[in-house]
Structure formats: C-alpha cells, structure tokens
Amino acid sequence: PGRIYQGRRDAQPERVDLPAASLAKYVDSPMIMGEHLRSWELDSPSDAIHTFDAVAPQAESLELPHARVARFSHMLAESEAIFGPFPWGQYRFLIVLNDDLPGFGLEHRESTFIRYAESTLVNSERSRISMNTVPHEYIHVWVGKLRAQEGLLHDDYHTPGDTRMMWVYEGLTSYYDEVLAARTGLTSFEQFRDGWIATIERYMLQAGRLWKSVEDTGAGLRHLRETSPRFEDLRRRQDYYAEGSLFWMEADAIIRGATDNQRSLDDFARRFFDVAPPDTDGDVVEHTRQDVVDALHAVYSGVDWDALIRERIESPRSTLEFDSLADRLGYRFDFQPEPFTSSDKSSSNGRSANLRSSIGFTVNESGEIRSIIVDSPGWRAGLGYDMKIVGVRTRASGESTTAYSAAALREAVRESADTGQVDLLVEWDGVLRPVTIAYDGGLRYPSLVPVDGKPDFLRAIAEPRTPAPPAPPDSPTLRQTDRPD
C-alpha cells in the first residue's frame, strides 16, 4: 500500500494498493499524478481501453480540442490497419505538461510517458502542433514491445543489449510516426512533405555518413545521445532514427512503384508483426536481420533487400546524394533561390541564418558561427566555430561594410550569384580580419518538385486507410472524465 502526499492525486483514490507483480512489470509501469489531472477515453477498434491522461500545473492547460481527440482515436485505427490487432489488454498515454522539465517520450508495453510544454494541448489545433511523439511511442506497441531485435533484451537490467538493429526499432517507428501523423491530420500534407525535405537536406550535408554507417550509430547509441558542440556532422548522432526512416521510405516507394501502388510497406508491417504476443512480463518476440529480409522479400521479390540493407544501413555511404529516393517517390530534389518549405519561409526573415546549403554554416542573432560544414565555401575561406561575423558588405549598402545582421548576410549571399563572392568582417579571439568567401550560388532552399508523368507516391503514402471519426463541436467524440477538487 502507498499514500499520495498531501495536495496531490493520481487517477486512483488517495490510498493506492499495488498488487504483487514482477520487477519487469513495475519497471514497465510509470505513473503520473497531480492536483490537475484529466483523462479522455479514446475510441479504439479493439476491445482494449485506451486512455489519454494529462497532468499540468494549471487546470486551464488541460483543454484538449475535440478535433485533436478525434485525431488520436483515428490514429488507433490507422495503427491497426498497418501493424495488425492491438496485442495487449489496455493502453494509457501519460502526458506531463510542464515548462520546467526537459522534453521526453518513453515507450512501455501498455503505456507511454511523454512531457510536453504546458500550452501544447490548448494550442494543438490552433497552432497545428503535430505532437508526433504520441504516434511514435504508440507504434512501439508493435515495434519494440511486441517484436524486437535478437539480443537487445536480457533477463536482467545489467547486461548491455545488442543495439545494431535500431534502424528497425527506431527507424521504422520514426518513418511511421510521420505517416500516421499525415494520415490522421495531426499534420497537413505540406507539413509531411516539408519534414522529409528537411531530413533529406540534413543528410545530404552530413559528411559523417561517408565514414560511419547507420548501423554503427546504433551500436554506439550510448555515446551519441547527447549533442556535440563541435563537428556533429562528422561525429554523427543517433541517426538510426531519421536516416533509418529514409531507408523505410525508400523501401515503401520501391514496393509501391513495382506493384502499381497495390502493395506497400504496410503489407510488410502487417506480415512482420503477425505474431502471438508473449505472456511473460518484459518478453518480446525476437527477430533477426534475416527475418526482416524475408518479410520484405515476401511482399516484393524484385529487389535484393539484403544488398540494399548492406548499402544503405550497414556500410558508410559512397555519396551523400538522395536522387534515387526522390525519383522513386515521383519527385526531384532541388534547390531554389526562394524559400519553399513553411519552416524556411518563416525563418527567412529571422534574426539568425541557416546557410548550410549555400556557404555552409549557421549563425545566431549575434553573428556567431554555431555550425559549419567541412569543405564548404565558408570552411575553405577559413571560417570556424565561434568566430563572430561583425560586418557584411553588400551592393545594397553601396559596397561598404555594414554591421552584421542576418538580413544583410542573406542579401550578400543572394548577391553572390552576380558577384561570385561574399565579403565579411570577422572577429576571432579579439582580432578583426576580412574574409572573402568564393561562392557564386546565391541563396539555396531545398524543395521537392513533382515530376510530370510520374505517380505521386509521397501523397499516396499520406492517404488514410480508415475513415476518420467525427468530432462535432457541441460534444466530445470521446468520453472525458475530470477529477475536480
């Protein structure tokens, strides 16, 4: 038995009697509590009760729009359309709304534990906040908690697991969290597309891919969790998430293209996770690399999946390009002189500047270089981390050097298409020096351009497979319970 300390409550009465259970069960069973807690029961296609629970410092933060609750219900149906029946007895989304805690999301067999900013629920529909962590952690019901790679889990909490196949555990999950968000309206198609544009651009500029494989980022995950203040493009991070997701997107596009959109990665997922749930707490149905290859081959046998995994996942890349992926989706990845994605449009007038795809670095509002790409035009001109740009020369300023601003720097890069250079005044360790960057490419913003006459598989991937439940404005779609004082 236990007692919640004075002034706090959880979803149970004040006295809590915890049943006898295995250590694995308790480790896998988080709990939230607080003075202000609300719960919504979601409409699930299975018999298992699904509840969305949220706790916040202020009661007014616990207003979840009916449309958002309906999208979460739709997410449950879309998930089962992809992965098969929900395998457990219940599920709870445990949400902590707090501005003072770091963001996190942690999957469990029958729940997930997520922290969001306090205003997230209230603004979720108005500001189109995707809340992608919700579908991401829910997908782990199947990817990681029903099936997981051989050697990842052990009978104790001391033996390190084999994490080389995290490109399945987290890569497949990361791919489908974007897909589920698009299919359920958590994101618009434009947001879905723009997210992939940003991911492709990111990895086209990541030189670490030339020496360190995706598999290797999984093997070294314990050392790569934290960001590095220097040369992260060479060091790499836990890229089995995002670059792993690009492999699964390519697999989806290959299958759709070869079968005239009659089959897809959804067919792989349904086959791969069609296993009997284990009865023992903490157990999973293990899979091997060969199991993945065999399941992909069963859906479409016209590709050497073993070789593709070796090339895309298990080996350093010979090139940083993604031309084949865009082409298979029915698009061309290109750069334009004007912002294309919503993110680039909103940041194009900002006080900081991301010029990684042009002169090769980012600067903050004070002009300090925060990241730089090795062998980029800026790098070749001698620029480096923490150097500070204090002056910029533009034609608009009459060829004189003006004080740094992100707008002036962007203008100088824009003019480089005619001038062939970008002239800066840089301060480093108390010393000022002029720097000329040899560059004539102008501003470059990434885009995905549809190719005439080719099927649009990106849009096909985002199409829902189940009907969306209604969310009338006069009553919640889902039963809501409140625990007032």
Regions found by a protein language model. Give the residues of each.
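Generic detection of short hydrophobic beta-strand segments and adjacent strand-loop junctions
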Residues: 16-18, 40, 114, 433-439
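Juxtacatalytic substrate-recognition/specificity segment
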Residues: 39-166
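Post-HExxH zinc-binding segment in Zn-dependent metallohydrolases
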Residues: 112-117, 121, 146-147, 158-209
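C-terminal recognition in membrane/secretory proteostasis and scaffolding
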Residues: 177, 187-485
